[in-house]
Structures are given as C-alpha cells and as structure tokens.
Amino acid sequence: MTVLYDEIMVRYGELSTKGKNRGYFINRLAKNIREVLADMPELKITAVRDRAHIELNGADYAEVSNRLTKVFGIQNFSPSIKVEKSMPIIKKEVVALFKEIYSEGQTFKIATRRADHNFELDSTELNIALGDVVFDNFSYAKVQMKKPDITLRVEIRQDATYLSFEDIKGAGGMPVGTAGRGHLMLSGGIDSPVAGYLALKRGVEIEAVHFASPPYTSPGALKKAKDLAAKLTVFGGAITFIEVPFTEIQEEIKAKAPQAYLMTITRRFMMRVVDRVREERGGKVIINGESLGQVASQTLGSMSAINEVTNTPVIRPVVTMDKNEIIEIAEKIDTFNLSILPFEDCCTVFAPPSPKTNPKLENCIQYEKRMDVEGMVDRAVKGIMLTTIAGENWDQTEEEEFADFL
C-alpha cells in the first residue's frame, strides 16, 4: 500500500479536562512537538483548541510518525491526504484511496466533519454522497456503523478537504513542562532514567543532575549519563544536563566518616546539593530512581535518614517496582543497553563493602560535624556545568559548535 500523506492531525490526551488552563497546555504541547521535530524545518505545525496539524511539505512521514508516538500529551494522530474542496475531486480521491486500502470482505464507514459551514453539502449529505460513490465503484462494499474495518474521516476545512483512515496511538500522559520543573538525580544506572521517563509522562520538565568524581569516574561515565539524558529528550524536547563536581565531597566523607556510613552520608550530601540546584533553578521537586529495598541506601531507614536534609518533596516513581518491572520499562524506552555499559559512577566507586541498612540519624549528624558541610555544598554548586541536550545526537552538535568557535 502506497499512500502519500500531506498532513498529520494530532489529537490531545488529558487536555480535555484542563478547563481554563487548556490554552497553556496546548501551547506547551505544540512547543514540545516543535522541539522533537526541530531538525525538520520543512514542517509547519499549527495547534488549535481541539487538535494540532502538522503539514509535512515533503518530509518523511514515517520518521515524523515514529517521533510523535513518543511525545507525551498526544492521545492519537491520523495521517491525512489534502485534496481540493470540490465534490467531483473529493469523490475521485476517495475512490483512488479505497483502491489502495479497501479489500473484499471488509466493512467501511464514512465520518464527515464540516468546519466550513459554507460548503455545498452538510455532514449528513456528504456521508451519503461519499458512501454512494464507494458502492458505485466497489461491488463488494459493505457498510457498518459500529466498529467497521475502515473508517474514512473526511474533514472540510476553509483551505481544503482532508481524508484520513488511520488512528495511531500516542504516548498519552501530559505535555512535558505543564506540571512544573523537577530535578532528576541521574546516575548511570537502570533505575534513574526510568524514574525520569515516568516523571516526564506526568508533565514534569526535568533537569538532569549528575554527580561526577574525576579522576575516580571517567569521561566515559559522564558521556554515558549525557547519552541517557538524550534518550529522554524524545518524550518532550531538550533537557538541561547539570554536572556536579563531587570529588572533594567524596574524599572528605571517606576521610572523616566510618565506612559503614559512607553511603548514607554521601547520599545526604547529594540531596543537599541537588536541593540547592533546584532552588536556584526554579524546580519544585527532586526526582530519583530509588526502589524500596533494592540496595542498602534504599531501605526505609536509609531513606528517612537521607531525606532529613531537605523539606523539598522527593518523588520516587519506581519505589514500589521490582527490578524486572523497571528493566521492562528501560528496554521499552531504549535506555537499558546504555545503562548496563561498564562505567562506574561516583556511588559505586566509593561504595563500602558493608553499608548500614538502618543508619541512625543522630550518628549521621555527629559524623557530619567533622566536615565543613555548607562550604563543601557551596563549592559544589558553584562548580556546576550545564549542557543543553537537544536530541540523541547532542555530542555531534557540541562538536560542531566547538569547531565553529575555533
């Protein structure tokens, strides 16, 4: 079957429930769609109250369709053929389309929407006229109003007529950014990218905070984390990647805290740093990939001791999931194979052999009195480096910009 499409009609998901904020949600979804399709300048994207329209202008439909299936906030979309707003031409194009898509034994239905009320026929008359032309040209034609094999949608707009027959399922959820901004603690593991994905699905715009401890962690580990952030851009556009210099803090903790408390105190410092970054950059929540009971720092006792350093809400999207459930999502969003690459992050490099599973808060506070907590956090926050990850080829763009600078 060869059908050349001219436009894609996008239908919104949960936006129908958003009342007075509907316009904001629609504009944000349109922005996200434009970002995801930014390298295809021939596209023209228009968003209106109940749907968005993407004029292809010769762009590769298959590539556009593949990207749209991942954008949160889209319920479904339909590729359309644009034809002249004239009954003889509409009939001719309907017959030509049915020759491509309609087979003996199938049922069909015509569903017309008339946005141009000055058109010569109303919706009912159009349904009858186009149904008749199908019967006239296909002896085996059989109409069925409920759940037909093919529903031909005909939309009469001011500029032209649009024919469509496919509904492609979107990602659902809410447009990224409509729930505000959150800061994702992105390691190089399996869990945190999945947590980021699930936060994106509910409309949270994420900035990815990654703790790097050179020379203990390698440039490869840093690139891996950026590549993981890039995998998440397909769901709603560019992500700001925030690299935190963490070497001083980890060396100080290792020198001044008992081995059993290294992990707990390290996580407390991470929480302090990410909370400061969140505050400075207008975030509302902290997001991490903790899964209850998976490792020593993710018991209820450990989480309680770590959380004590902040009053900011901490969202843990995968907290109740089994590892297999998390892996299933990681494979679905194409982060799993990256996550299992053998680069150590700052937590694994300094991990003690027998960490406390139920650390006492008073002990954490006592050990931290040996350190310049505020000064260390200040220096880490002042040393952050920001990178805009605008797609999976972010490193090529970075190289091109560097070459231009030279």
UniProtKB/Swiss-Prot annotation:
Protein name in the entry: Probable tRNA sulfurtransferase
Q: Does the keyword Ligase apply?
A: no
Q: Where in the cell is it found?
A: Cytoplasm
Q: Which GO terms describe its cellular component?
A: cytosol
CDD domains registered for this protein in UniProt:
PPase_ThiI, THUMP_ThiI
Name the gene for this chain.
thiI
Q: Which residues bind ATP?
A: M185, L186, H210, F211, R267, G289, Q298
Documented EC number(s):
2.8.1.4
- Protein's GO biological process: thiamine biosynthetic process; thiamine diphosphate biosynthetic process; thiazole biosynthetic process; tRNA 4-thiouridine biosynthesis
Q: What does this protein do?
A: Catalyzes the ATP-dependent transfer of a sulfur to tRNA to produce 4-thiouridine in position 8 of tRNAs, which functions as a near-UV photosensor. Also catalyzes the transfer of sulfur to the sulfur carrier protein ThiS, forming ThiS-thiocarboxylate. This is a step in the synthesis of thiazole, in the thiamine biosynthesis pathway. The sulfur is donated as persulfide by IscS.
Catalytic function, reaction form: [ThiI sulfur-carrier protein]-S-sulfanyl-L-cysteine + a uridine in tRNA + 2 reduced [2Fe-2S]-[ferredoxin] + ATP + H(+) = [ThiI sulfur-carrier protein]-L-cysteine + a 4-thiouridine in tRNA + 2 oxidized [2Fe-2S]-[ferredoxin] + AMP + diphosphate; [ThiS sulfur-carrier protein]-C-terminal Gly-Gly-AMP + S-sulfanyl-L-cysteinyl-[cysteine desulfurase] + AH2 = [ThiS sulfur-carrier protein]-C-terminal-Gly-aminoethanethioate + L-cysteinyl-[cysteine desulfurase] + A + AMP + 2 H(+)
Q: Does the keyword Metal-binding apply?
A: no
Say which species the protein is native to.
Lactococcus lactis subsp. cremoris (strain MG1363)
The organism's taxonomy opens as: Bacteria, Bacillati, Bacillota, Bacilli, Lactobacillales
The similarity annotation says: Belongs to the ThiI family.
**Keywords from the named record:** ATP-binding, Cytoplasm, Nucleotide-binding, RNA-binding, Thiamine biosynthesis, Transferase, tRNA-binding
